[in-house]
Curated annotation (Swiss-Prot):
It is an enzyme of class 4 (lyase). GO terms for molecular function: chorismate synthase activity; FMN binding. This reaction introduces a second double bond into the aromatic ring system. This is Chorismate synthase. Homotetramer. NADP(+) binds at R40, R46.
Amino acid sequence: MLRWLTAGESHGPELIAVLEGLPAGVPVSLDGIRADLARRKLGYGRGARMAFEQDELSLSTGVVHGRTLGSPIAVRIGNTEWPKWVDIMSPEPVDPEKLQGARAAALTRPRPGHADLVGMQKYDFDEARPVLERASARETAARVALGAVARAFLAELGITLVSHTLSIGPVRVPEGAPLPTPADVDALDADPLRCFHPETSARMVAEVDDTKSSGDTVGGVVEVLAYDLPPGLGSHVHWDRRLDSKLAAALMGIQAIKGVEVGDGFLTTTRRGSEAHDELFSTDAGIGRSTDRAGGTEGGMSTGTVLRVRAGMKPIATVPRALRTIDTATGGAAPANHQRSDVCAVPAAGVVAEAMVALTLADAVLEKFGGDSVGETLRNLRGYLDAIPEGRRTGADLVDEADAAPPAAPEA
């Protein structure tokens, strides 16, 4: 199984992440991780911090000459802005004279929608700085770095991930629009909002512009697709072993995510049973499904079709036209603290969601197929697939009902 942990504050010296349980032999490069960290900064509507904040990446342990060793992997992401925060975020006591000025002022006006107030209550802080530093989405850089390593492992098994933006505010990709494939990743990353539907992307840009001009923020929905998963990841046996349960928890753990769907999700609740499920048909290639409404999972297990999971991101809570709050130092009404923020970070949320799905799937693969090396894991996977009896093997991802063999007539 995989175990992983991140540490670090938004304006601290560095973020640290440790990943344990990955087999030996996974090809890992700093350039590959840097590429995903750069993708995390993409998207129309991002704030100024993305322009000047650089990720100083290093691998401390677990990788030698571009291959994992099977031992814990430690990633460090240095903060180029640290010199500005040395005194304010120092782990050692600092002369109060050095803590003068606006940057060091106590943050006593908690922001609605953030962890500020509840964190102050829970941890007995008299200001929000100790809370917001860790609650910040800056922490997701560490998760994206680990996700890049997990993606490299999955790629060795032929599994690839793609994310794209489905909606920004009320602007949404039309139902039934083509899904992006791994071949479309470069085109997606070149789009200002990582949307695969050009006409919708242009309307999304206009929505972000309108939101910015009104001093507001906007959210949206992203979708992650996983191609070429084997059937049988996860289990129906216990709630906490269900693959969709693990994916939902992983995605809900991303800052500002307020909802998750698997497959057609809540749309399925509007249909009758005869139109809500994926019928099975026999083909020359094996068993196929007429649709993928379930989104690649049934009974808590992967089906072998394309996995589809969606995450809904709320509008960023740090609103330029500051929301109303209470100054906890005086008890009086006040505008909320406002720091640099994005108008829209939905495209970046897609990249973070990719990382979380990659880590979750890598863990599920290792739970099912084990292996102390990539080669052993791959042999176990192939052996499992070869052992599935011919009459139970799945073939093409989707089958056109008109081309499928009719179901056998029941015996008299």
